Amino acid sequence: SPGTKNGKSDMSSYLRDTTLVPLLKEAEEGKRAVFFIDAAHFVLAPFLGYLWCFTRLFLKAPSGRQRFNVLGALNAITHELITITNETYINAQSVCDLLWKISRLNLSMPITFILDNARYQRCTTVNTLAAQLNLELIILPPYSPNLNLIERLWKFVKKQCLYSKYYSEFANFKNAITDCLQKTHSNYKRELDSLLTLNFQTFNKSHFVNL
């Protein structure tokens, strides 16, 4: 029989309606800059597409598991992408570097960042710098990637660069991702303008079902 409604879905719907929608309306009117922030961790490993055949196939796979980390900030309206990258790990300092980078753009309007609930993004260090730079941070509820616009961009990049692709060297792997990210505002603009619309699905009608 059906159980109770998912409380996290209610939180997502509430934040979308009371916070995101008004902020994005201001952004559309040119009164505010809204950036969606998230980190993607690209690992040099096989990313297989779909394949059906009668015989077993052996596919080339790169050795090692080197990572190329990208912390990105996606402008909700222009779809401009600003990044901090490394090959180690993303932490609070990475977020601070990104805040500084955007602050130095000297945008003549209030700036709001939409971030997920990762601990390094909501720590004291990040909050202190944001207050110092007069930047607003909006932390999304746990498990609500549907409200973070940049998640769609990461899926697009993986499809373009990783699925069913083989890279023998980490440098080639990294260059392919970097090249794709640099073309988001040019070669891929039409596709991304269609993908990155400000429509956010929530699941407030979902129920747990006991089978």
Language model segments and positions:
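Short functional hotspots at interaction and active-site rims
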Residues: 1-211
